[in-house]
Design a protein with these regions (language model features):
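Small-residue packing motifs within transmembrane alpha-helices
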Residues: 6-11
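C-terminal motif of bacterial Sec signal peptides marking the signal peptidase cleavage site
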Residues: 14-17
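Flexible, low-complexity junctional segments that flank or bridge functional domains
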Residues: 19-254, 269, 463-492
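C-terminal "post-core" interaction segments
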Residues: 231, 235-242, 247, 252-254, ...
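Active-site beta-strand/loop signature of hydrolases that rely on acidic residues for catalysis
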Residues: 260
Length: 492
């Protein structure tokens, strides 16, 4: 039986007729308890999951009767446990779920509940169980942007309670709308609480523009561009293109691309960014996708291939710098779509990485909700169909559905990309982002100009990240596929 697949702007459309596993339905367990969430999870993962062929419990012929299927669905009462223990493949590090699909999809668009402080967390103390935070940057137009708090400041407590591994989640990421940070100083590696406190309030619907800083520097006759980009959010692709238009107008010949705090996001935004750096020649292959075995049986090479872009999604001509070299600032918080830019550019451009090793996330995902009747697209989230999602099930899953490889077939960077020039951030000298004296940027400028000067890049107290605030947003470090793709699919 023929089925038709349409993937457009992150929405996969699959026309489904009845098949063996379509005939199995299991909305209730033997005792009448609802297992609709588990039912949705299994059916969605059976179609789309990258490791479907490797996970025995997701096999097309796993169940011979409804009773057997229902017994499986009720084997874990908690949907989270069901996903983790029954469906997730052992090699899968990044698939996740949410009990609130609206929060998840808002976050993909750059909308979150936040007070605007983006921070990293650090373990310290005799047993490495105490925690302190350091401010990375402040989101514009947030509550924090109106308060006396800035990059480089440290905090050790919340509402008078010292942070540790047991309480930091509740204190920093709990339901409390308002909290007070108890600040601290650092000198010679020693952290000392001070008398400063900052009250902060989380805002619902805070929108973060990821195009954070755009600068040009004229140093010894060389025009150097700098862009700090903090998330691949396709709603801001035009802003990104405008930033490159500014850099192009300024006549920059070298670019420092700061992705140190960028956890990823839209695959298409990564394609546009790479085109702005290198080329808008649509004959050049950017990346290719690999899906699960049963989907790959019907995909053509053209279906799986993405090329560099000459226009944004809105039809605006790409502002490209046509560079043959780019300097990328990285840390362990540089993940997914950030790494995709590095990998996609590598065959064409000399990518000089400065900082520390990236996260190592090379798979892409799709957002799935309990909408099995979407016209030709079972379970794939579609904004216009929110009223068709099962009102009794607000869960969403974000499973990995494929892996990207560059134009020469390389995709093996699960250990991350090591820097060409290692330089850790220094808690005692984080510097001002965008300032040419900020250590990572200064190092890049030194490499570009070839003038070493007398700058001392010794790191007194290196950042050894435990986790960061962005890892507690619904989208975390996710890479989301959003591309036009039209396929004929015949599922056995």
């Amino acid at each position: 039986m023929k089925k038709f697949l349409l993937l457009f702007m992150g929405i996969v459309s699959l026309s489904i007729s009845c098949s063996k596993d379509d005939d199995i339905v299991g909305p209730e367990g033997p005792g009448g308890e609802s297992v609709s969430v588990q039912d949705f999870m299994w059916k969605a993962m059976n179609i789309w999951y990258f490791w479907q062929q490797d996970q025995a419990d997701l096999a097309d012929d796993r169940f011979s009767t409804n009773e057997e299927y229902n017994a499986f669905l009720t084997s874990e009462a908690d949907p989270a446990d069901f996903f983790d223990n029954k469906l997730r493949y052992t090699e899968d590090r990044f698939s996740f779920y949410s009990d609130d699909y609206k929060s998840l999809t808002d976050n993909l668009s750059g909308i979150s509940r936040s007070n605007g402080v983006e921070f990293g967390l650090f373990l310290y103390g005799d047993n490495d169980t105490d925690i302190f935070g350091y401010v990375r940057y402040i989101v514009a137009n947030s509550d924090a942007s109106t308060k006396d708090i800035s990059r480089g400041e440290l905090f050790t407590g919340v509402d008078g309670q010292s942070l540790n591994e047991s309480n930091y989640r509740d204190l920093l990421f709990g339901e409390n709308a308002t909290y007070t940070l108890n600040m601290a100083d650092i000198a010679d590696g020693e952290i000392t609480p001070n008398d400063k406190s900052v009250e902060l309030t989380k805002q619902d619907g805070l929108v973060e523009n990821p195009v954070f800083i755009v600068n040009s520097y004229d140093i010894n006759g060389q025009k150097i561009g700098y862009l700090m980009y903090n998330g691949f959010t396709n709603e801001f692709d035009e802003d990104l293109n405008d930033a490159f238009g500014q850099l192009k107008s300024d006549g920059v010949t070298d670019l420092v691309l700061d992705l140190r705090y960028n956890p990823g996001g839209s695959v298409n935004s990564s394609r546009l960014l790479s085109s702005m750096v290198f080329s808008s020649n649509t004959n050049n292959v950017y990346i290719r996708q690999r899906w699960n075995d049963k989907l790959l049986e019907v995909f053509t090479d053209e279906d799986l291939t993405d090329y560099f872009a000459d226009k944004t999604g809105a039809g605006t001509a790409i502002n490209t710098l046509s560079l043959n070299r780019v300097y990328v600032l990285t840390t362990g918080s540089s993940a997914s779509a950030s790494e995709l830019v590095i990998n996609g550019l590598n065959p064409y451009v000399e990518v000089i990485k400065i900082g520390t090793t990236t996260r190592g996330k090379n798979e892409f995902s799709l957002t799935m909700v309990d909408d099995p009747n979407r016209d030709g697209a079972p379970f794939i989230y579609t904004p216009s169909r929110e009223n068709q999602i099962n009102p009794e099930n607000s869960w969403a899953i974000q499973p990995l559905v494929g892996r990207n490889e560059n134009s020469v077939g390389f995709s093996d960077y699960t250990a991350g990309f090591d820097p060409d020039i290692e330089l850790k951030e220094d808690l005692e000298n984080l510097g001002v982002l965008g300032d040419e004296n900020e250590p990572l940027l200064a190092k890049a400028i030194e490499e570009i100009t070839g003038i070493s000067g007398k700058r001392d890049f010794t790191v007194k107290t290196p950042v050894e990240l435990f986790t960061s605030s962005k890892m507690f947003t619904p989208m975390k470090d996710n890479m989301v596929l959003d591309k036009p793709l039209h396929l004929n699919l015949d599922l056995k």
